[in-house]
């Protein structure tokens, strides 16, 4: 059977069905390179049902889903159709924004703090922003008293990009979404941006590609880079964010960057970096 069929089966899990096929395919191929024998098993199988009877394939299948959950699923809204129903409803625009932001864990956690966050991070009036691994966070710019002229965002779901573009258009903000895998970035990521957001993304990068954060940040072109870290693990049992602070300070020092400001909300540590 074809690898495409395996990819579609992986994406049948609701939280994963909005990820681009291309991203899932690259991840599957990368992991299969470590298990060449599985590729032969897939080619010879007549159906997904047959494949799932193979214990080694089933383990691989579950591991891929687990990785996608950690990279994307845990941060993404589960119901894209519901977001469009909200946008097409007659409720006030501000309520639409609130209802949408409640649909993903990171934005829901920030919901009561967005005014404070934007007041703290915009050391200069924003003009041009890019939000890397954005999810639906760009929608929250509604709560900033200063709106940028242009807002770009990067995600691995075209559905998420379309939602962000639609909502920002309603705010008269020029916007554009890039479907980019940050592990294999394209040139758009390295253009100049006044503000770059990299929120709750670094721990995932370092888990799956240790050392890549430094390589990525060294190539970014910005006035202000705002990174953030969750203060707790997903289970809420472990304190995490402050453990990343000295790590981030060392990375900034190694790259010749400066830490301009730090602040915390209830759930998140923010660090503002300048070249």
In which residue ranges do the predicted regions lie?
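S-adenosyl-L-methionine
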Residues: 162-199, 205
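Conserved SAM-binding loop of SAM-dependent methyltransferases across substrates and taxa
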Residues: 135-148
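Conserved beta-strand signature within the Rossmann-like core of class I S-adenosyl-L-methionine
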Residues: 221-232
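Conserved class I S-adenosyl-L-methionine
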Residues: 125-137
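Conserved SAM-binding motif I beta-strand of class I
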Residues: 150-155
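Conserved SAM/SAH-binding beta-strand->alpha-helix loop
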Residues: 157-159
């Amino acid at each position: 059977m074809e690898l495409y069929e395996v990819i579609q089966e992986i994406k049948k899990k609701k939280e994963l069905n909005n990820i681009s096929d291309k991203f899932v395919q690259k991840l599957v191929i990368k992991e299969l390179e470590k298990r060449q024998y599985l590729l032969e098993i897939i080619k010879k199988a007549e159906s997904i049902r047959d494949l799932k009877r193979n214990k080694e394939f089933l383990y691989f299948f579950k591991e891929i889903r687990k990785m996608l959950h950690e990279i994307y699923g845990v941060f993404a809204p589960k119901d894209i159709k519901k977001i469009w129903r909200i946008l097409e409803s007659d409720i006030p625009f501000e309520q639409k924004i609130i209802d949408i932001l409640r649909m993903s864990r990171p934005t829901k956690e920030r919901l009561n703090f967005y005014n404070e966050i934007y007041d703290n991070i915009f050391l200069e009036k924003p003009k041009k922003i890019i939000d890397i691994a954005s999810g639906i966070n760009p929608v929250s710019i509604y709560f900033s008293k200063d709106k940028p002229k242009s807002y770009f965002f990067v995600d691995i779901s075209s559905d998420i990009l379309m939602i962000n573009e639609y909502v920002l258009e309603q705010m008269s903000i020029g916007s554009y979404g890039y479907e980019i895998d940050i592990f294999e970035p394209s040139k758009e990521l390295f253009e100049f941006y006044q503000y770059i957001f990299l929120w709750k993304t670094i721990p995932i990068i370092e888990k799956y590609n240790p050392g890549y954060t430094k390589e990525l940040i060294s190539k970014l072109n910005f006035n202000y880079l705002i990174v953030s870290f969750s203060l707790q693990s997903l289970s809420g049992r472990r304190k995490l964010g402050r453990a990343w602070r000295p790590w981030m300070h060392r990375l900034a020092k190694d790259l010749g960057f400066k830490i301009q400001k730090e602040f915390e909300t209830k759930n998140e540590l923010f660090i503002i970096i300048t070249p």
